[in-house]
Amino acid sequence: MEASKKKMKFPSAFSILFIILLIAIGLTWLIPSGSYSKLSYDTTEHHFIVKTHGIPDQSYPATEQTLNQLNIKIQLSNFTNGIIKKPIAIPDTYQRIEQHEKGITDMIHAMVDGTIEVADIMIFIFILGGMIGVINKTGAFNAGLMSLTKKTKGNEFSVVFAVCVLMLLGGTACGIEEEAVAFYPILVPVFLALGYDSIVCVGAIFLAASMGTAFSTINPFSVVIASNAAGIPFTEGMGFRTLGLILGGACVIAYMYWYCKKLRANPEFSYTYDDRQAFYDLYMKDIDPNATVEFTFRRKLILILFSGAFPLMVWGVMFGGWWFPQMATSFLAITIIIMFISGLPEKDVVNGFTHGASELVGVALIIGLARAVNIILEQGMISDTILDYMTHLVDGMNGGVFIIGQLIVFIFLGLVVPSSSGLAVLAMPIMAPLADTVGIPRDIVVSAYNWGQYIMLFLAPTGLVLVTLQMLGIPFNKWLKFVMPIVGCQFVISSILLLAQVFMYAQ
């Protein structure tokens, strides 16, 4: 008999998603299948198309009168100018349909289909990894880190603070989510060189960006499209969303300061202390913190080009209509320029690119596997049933109870439909009119949608959490230990602000 038992390890990200896939299959047998009729705008024929399960598609003129007849309180211009591109659920059209049970074969198909659907994100991640591999070959990272650690000695938290603020602003303005993956390769070595751990890395980037996205002010992918789907200007409720951003941001920064201070005083305090060497080897194996590396003009130029790729990406998303193909193209172009000015042999830069890309294969596959869960739920036709049940759950409540109920409903729906824009066009045309029945403004429901679904963002394995943790080698249980205080903080802030809006409106 062994003197000591091996410590039980938490399942890997792949195993967690596989278990969730099996649960999703089980739900397609337990939850009745159902569907809302969906309205979409045909940009070619310039008319509305209504899709109802079991009957041929119906065509309607693209007019305000049609929208009024269907009880959709959305301006026609939001369809014609392309703001709303996804099908909108039509209120009061839910119907039960034949059961769409799924099995093991469907699950395997969903894994493949999910990977194909996120191919653009995967290519972006591979190019990002390749870029990092090339820059590591040049020695630019090593030289830059040595320079930074000397300049910030004694004031290391200033770097964490600056990153948190930038991520908060990026989240609230343009909803940085998948794009945040691009920041880890540049920032993780910085945090490690400053003496921090993997938790600080994910906290300053993912946690701060998610809090900013939760309290979105002008984010076109959540609060803007949700407001349009609710039939109101997105500026309504802006004041409370801004206040939430300030309070939520202060909560994240204060929490990060507490954790960093504890970590600096005692490295064994780290929530990921047992995994520290593997994480260090992953990101710092090509970097010697004690080496003297000359920070030449060429290396400075390479880091300037590398750093410039990120504000270019943010600008493209916000103002240029970019998505992952365009972002991948810009990163590849900058990588090619770096290859030419690196001064390295052709074989070295190519090997650096392929090696860097290969190290992110696991991360890319996790994204495809997470998408497979959503495919099973969609094909099982149970998402609309869950929404219909939730709608009846909060219908008829008084204002304060109603809005907290909405917050909880959207927390749950954030697990079922992890896409912010997808949840907005699915749920908002159904949920927003309920606000009229209890006598509160629709913008409060929009806030409940945004704050609720992003509480789940911190936890949902079907979202970006497992992608991030896979990239940094953090077990899911260690993440839960770290993030739960922030989840509680956001729930309290959201509840107080929602109740304050309801009571202020009632006066």
Q: Positions of the model-derived regions?
A:
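Core transmembrane alpha-helical segments of multi-pass membrane transporters/permeases
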Residues: 13-22, 50-142, 322-385
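Long, contiguous bundles of hydrophobic transmembrane helices that form the permeation core
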Residues: 2-14, 35-50, 57, 239-352, ...
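C-terminal transmembrane helix pair
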Residues: 11, 394-507
